[in-house]
Amino acid sequence: MSRPIRFGVAAHAVLDADEWRRLAQRVEHLGYATLLLPDHTNPQLAPIPALVAAAAATTTLRVGTQVLCNDLRNPVIAAKEVATLDLLSGGRADWGMGAGWLPADYDGSGIPFDPPGVRVRRLREAVELMRALFDGHPVEHRGEFYRSTGVSGTPRPVQRPHPPLLIGGAQERLLRWAGSVADIVSIGPSWQSRQIGPYPP
């Protein structure tokens, strides 16, 4: 199956409201398809409210997370935030998720930085739970990491069954899983330096 290639801009250090809106408008004007924000505890905008503002300042630009750090929020809350972003953007959201990789995010939040295998298993379970919540029906979930009793995913996203799922990561096991479940897989050359060769001096 062929899919169109989309080009996007990943923003990081904008902290001014007017500058953020202008950046979103500029990205759209230049013809990029998507504006993406990461999810870290360092000085940067919180992704979901910032992306709602970017969507409000534009008309066609897609907005998404690259990626939500799964361990920084419960998947029930994350599903509500992503669905709200999709609703308020008129169906222009991309749903980006990652297992978490930056120790500073965990240290600053007081969250244990578990081994990669544990974080990946938790991400897989969170994505499964969020998919169920996007359906809008009451969800009963008893998993290794999460429990949910009778909560309904509201609001429902505009895009059905859910916004395009972007999984970010570098670990081979995670990328194999991402290739089987995600609409978009985000990898960076710096994460794969052993496969493509070292950086130049």
Give the ranges of each region predicted by the language model.
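Active-site-adjacent structural elements that line small-molecule/cofactor binding pockets in enzymes
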Residues: 1-201
